[in-house]
Design a protein with these regions (language model features):
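A short, basic N-terminal segment
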Residues: 1-53, 259-261
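The conserved phosphate-sensing helix
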Residues: 230-244
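Sensor-1/coupling segment of RecA-like P-loop NTPase cores
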Residues: 59, 143-145, 156-180, 190
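Conserved NTP-binding/hydrolysis module of P-loop NTPases
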Residues: 17, 96-115
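Walker A/P-loop nucleotide-binding motif
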Residues: 49-70
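Conserved P-loop NTPase "ATPase switch" module shared by AAA+ and STAND
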Residues: 124-149
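Conserved catalytic segments around the Walker B and adjacent sensor/switch elements
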Residues: 55, 78-94
């Protein structure tokens, strides 16, 4: 465990390898992940075909899907055709029931609650009908209930594409096979690869700079960082865990050396 005192003594202002809770702290030099954002933004502002209001983005485990989903949902997307599109992020591992899905949308929009799913849907549709804003649903994982999402996207087709959905999935063979009727709305399918070894190494270095260290390579061994990036096998999650363990080891070794010198 690295204490705040340890970090300050090592010339950091914060832990460089903890997960960012704010999606604005996004490393922009991961080519595939940057492309995901560009493609998704294009989908969000495209109102040409009202039938196509569902996008699927598929990537390998640990490739940054959650951060990308949160970043897209956190953004406010001005649209010349329909005002502003606001995003709602949902992790479908925690949204376990259909009513939780609808309740999440109602709560995020600040609408009155209801005990009926039908009333919840009607409340959402009435709000969007009377509002200049659009709604972007960003699902981190497969949809919990396809029926309600299908109903929302069907309504959107007849109402100037006011509801759009982006779904982030693990990149598997025939990812959308189980989407059933939702495939009729599919207007975007974009698979992306994991970051390269060099990209991960650059990310780890940049995180140290963002955490306040004036010269990360004076503390971290460059080859060790490249080895961590290589052993992560494309997983950003694994790379951050291993880098954190490496930093803790370095700090402990430095503390022991200082203790011996002070005797």
């Amino acid at each position: 465990m690295i204490s705040t005192t340890d970090l300050v003594n090592a010339k950091f202002l914060e832990h460089p390898f903890l997960r960012y809770t704010d999606p604005r702290f996004f490393f922009p030099h991961l080519a595939e992940q940057r492309k995901v954002l560009e493609v998704a933004y294009g989908f969000i502002i495209d109102n040409n075909d009202p039938q196509k209001n569902l996008g699927v983005l598929a990537g390998p485990i640990g490739s940054g899907k959650t951060m990308l989903a949160m970043k897209l949902a956190a953004g406010v997307h001005p649209n010349l055709d329909q005002g502003v599109t606001h995003g709602i992020y949902m992790n479908t591992n925690t949204v376990t029931e259909p009513r939780h899905f609808l309740m999440g949308v109602v709560d995020a929009l600040g609408l009155p609650s209801s005990r009926s799913n039908a009333n919840r849907l009607e409340t959402i549709f009435d709000f969007l009908s009377d509002s200049p804003q659009g709604l972007l649903l960003v699902l981190d994982g497969p949809p919990v209930n396809q029926d309600y999402l299908h109903e929302m996207l069907s309504w959107s087709v007849e109402n100037k594409k006011r509801i759009k959905a982006l779904v982030f999935l693990q990149d598997l063979y025939e990812t959308t096979t189980n989407f059933g009727g939702l495939n009729a709305f599919l207007g975007l399918y974009h698979p992306f690869r994991a970051p390269s070894i060099q990209e991960i190494a650059n990310l780890l270095y940049s995180r140290c700079k963002l955490a306040g260290h004036p010269d990360p390579l004076s503390l971290l061994d460059e080859q060790a960082i490249l080895n961590i990036a290589s052993e992560a096998h494309g997983s950003l999650t694994t790379a951050l865990i291993q880098a954190s363990q490496y930093l803790e080891q370095l700090i402990e070794e430095k503390k022991k050396r200082l203790t011996i010198m002070n005797i």
